[in-house]
Amino acid sequence: MTIFERSKKGRKAFRLPESDIPEYSLPDRFLRSTPPKLPEVSEPDVVRHYTDLARKNYSVDLGIYPLGSCTMKYNPKLNEKAANLEGFREIHPYQPVETVQGSLRLMYELKEMLCEITGMDDMTLQPAAGAHGELTGMLIVREYFKNRGDTGRKKVLVPDSAHGTNPASASMVGFEVVEIKSKNGMVDVEDLRKLLDEEVAAVMLTNPNTLGLFEKDILKIAEMTHECGALLYYDGANLNAIMGKVRPGDMGFDIVHLNLHKTFSTPHGMGGPGSGPVGVKKHLVDFLPFPQVKKNGELYELFVPEKTIGRVRSFFGNFPVLVKAYTYILTMGRDGLERVSEMAVLNANYLKKKIEKFLEIPYNGFCMHEFVASAEKVFRETGVRTLDIAKRILDFGVHPPTVYFPLIVPEALMIEPTETENKETLDKYAEILERVVKEAYENPDALKNAPHNTPVRRVNEVLASKKPVFRWRG
């Protein structure tokens, strides 16, 4: 039931006091011809409606949320308190810089810390999401070569295991995307060698990659990329696996985008809010978006980089998300962030060891923060697909993994438990997944018709994609 369907004429949740300001009639041209169709509800109606919706929802505050490549870690509530401090909450982006020195200091120190973590020389905090960061990075790549007069570089190389946003971001900027083949789950260096030429502008990589494997040839890849005059771009989706262990800048990457809403523990899902800062090495600093924050003595100021690509977001990005990430980094400290990565890798390997007893692991061995299992054998023997397994998992009150990604693994389940889950939770999740796989052999229809216990049963996803309904019509 929607809030509109709860509406009863004449009900009110709030009454305004009588105004002591003289009435003023707006000109007719500014008036609506009909009253707005707003719900008329009491305060209990509103509270109960949204409480009911919250009970039907699932979040990391309720349990494990092991979406691969999403890093759905628990978000400490201290971060929320910091973002809600009056000095941050009540400011306006048009205020004079002298009156928002605390906010500018936070942004300056945050980018300094992120540069230290990633091995970059400078960073913009403007992009509002990971894909937005990718787009910003690709705009920097394009502007860099345009500035050099090297306009023949029209290609971007992307592994076949890459996030779908990688080729999409490169294409949006006007680059031709060329796929690099994988070998044993990692970049095929020989295939890359064949593709590298004077037309290549950049190579986009995630390390660890989407299979949860560390690209062991990364230094060689960086050397080959730079020898042909191209730039090496780092998709920071999986940074949670390597903090304090190795830095993208030290691997040879020229550009990096981060996901503060993943690695640095700010709530995400359902479209945001996110933050996708972009860091660059020294030779690309002048191309960063504006405004940038700098420190001039004791004063923090805004400035425009010399060859800037322009604005990519209004004002300063998603500022409350920046506050939460800043709080998280200060709370954890260097040793704490390193421990985060250690525990993320440990949890993934522990869960993989449990799951490999009943599901295939195409690229087995030591993984990093996540791993990919395959239900291809289950599908072949029972007709039950990965989608059916994921839907049935919902009936047990936990969230399923990412499914059908990366595309190079048939019937894929991509699992990232993160560092914030304990052993008991991991054991329980493995137990649920094993039970569902066993049920696929004993009662496949139970999976094909799942979920059975959720407020919304299985939806027609094809119809929803082709004919989406985005708003309620009374």
From Swiss-Prot:
EC number: 1.4.4.2
Keyword Oxidoreductase: yes
One GO molecular-function entry: pyridoxal phosphate binding
One GO BP: glycine decarboxylation via glycine cleavage system
NCBIfam families in UniProt: PRK04366.1 (NF003346)
Taxonomy of the source species: Bacteria, Thermotogati, Thermotogota, Thermotogae, Thermotogales
Any Pfam family hit: GDC-P
EC class name: oxidoreductase
Cofactor(s) this protein cannot do without: pyridoxal 5'-phosphate
Chain positions found as N6-(pyridoxal phosphate)lysine: 262
Record HAMAP family: GcvPB (MF_00713)
Catalytic activity: N(6)-[(R)-lipoyl]-L-lysyl-[glycine-cleavage complex H protein] + glycine + H(+) = N(6)-[(R)-S(8)-aminomethyldihydrolipoyl]-L-lysyl-[glycine-cleavage complex H protein] + CO2
Highest taxon, organism lineage: Bacteria
This protein's UniProt keywords: Oxidoreductase, Pyridoxal phosphate
Annotated function: The glycine cleavage system catalyzes the degradation of glycine. The P protein binds the alpha-amino group of glycine through its pyridoxal phosphate cofactor; CO(2) is released and the remaining methylamine moiety is then transferred to the lipoamide cofactor of the H protein.
Family, similarity comment: Belongs to the GcvP family. C-terminal subunit subfamily.
GO cellular component, one term: glycine cleavage complex
Name of this protein: Probable glycine dehydrogenase (decarboxylating) subunit 2
Subunit structure of this chain's protein: The glycine cleavage system is composed of four proteins: P, T, L and H. In this organism, the P 'protein' is a heterodimer of two subunits.
